[in-house]
Structure formats: C-alpha cells, structure tokens
Amino acid sequence: MHVKSVTSIKKKPLVDAHGATALYQIFWQEDESGKVFRAKKPETMKSFRHFARITLEPGETNNMHTHRDAEQVYFVLRGGGTVQVGDERRTVKAGDAIFLPVGVPHGFFNTGERRTVLLLVGAKT
C-alpha cells in the first residue's frame, strides 16, 4: 500500500508551458527532474501517468497546452473558473470534473476572486 499526504509533498512551481501554477506531484511516473522511470513505480497503475494537485491564484492559468500521449481529468476541488478544451470554453466550479482527450489543446483559467484547487489525473494512451 502506498499512502502519501499532500502536506508532505514538495510544492513544485510551474513557470513553463503550464504558466505560473503550483503543482504537488502526489503519484507521478517521473522523478522531479522530469526523467521517466523505465519500470513502473510501485504506486502507479498500468496506464497511469500522474495524479496531482494544482493551485491557481486569481487571474492565473496553466496556459493552453496539449499532451500527445495522455488523456487527463481535472476535478475542481475548490474555487472555479473557465476551462477550455479545443475550441469549447465552459465555466466550472467546485465539484465539476472535466475530461481532457489526448491530443486536444486545453487550459484552465482562474477567473474568480479566490484560489482554485484542481485534482489532476492522467493516463497514457
């Protein structure tokens, strides 16, 4: 069994293609330098790629980006904003889940007045 508390995970600032967000890599198929492990880590599922928490302050975004080899789900834990998947934009709030298909540009924009917290789950395709 593998149990990790988000409070024990080192916050990783993202200031690259994902904008200035904070990422907590809870279960991740790569190490902190981005190196992908050849053998699956024991806490990961077969097609699993990552499980993380993303925080976005008001006005922040993780920028539009595409994953060529993974599909993802954002789950809004707190706050809300606008999510764009392809050409479609929708307003979302806490409790909403958004499926992000492989190869489709997507991004989350915190258009609210308080911090938004997302749960991110990804699987290789």
Predicted segments, located by residue:
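A short hydrophobic beta-strand segment most commonly corresponding to one strand
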Residues: V73, F99, R114-T125
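Glycine- and acidic-residue-biased ligand/ion/polar-headgroup-sensing regions
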Residues: D69-E71, V76-T82
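Conserved short histidine dyad/triad with adjacent acidic residue
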Residues: D31-K40, A52-R68, V102
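Short beta-strand His + acidic residue motifs that chelate non-heme Fe in jelly-roll/DSBH
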Residues: N63-M64, V83-Q84, L100, H106-G112
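Short acidic-glycine-tyrosine-enriched beta hairpin
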Residues: D87-V102
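A generic "binding-loop/recognition-motif" signal
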Residues: E60, D69, E88, V104-P105, ...
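A short, N-terminal "cap"/entry segment at the start of jelly-roll beta-barrel domains
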Residues: M1-F48
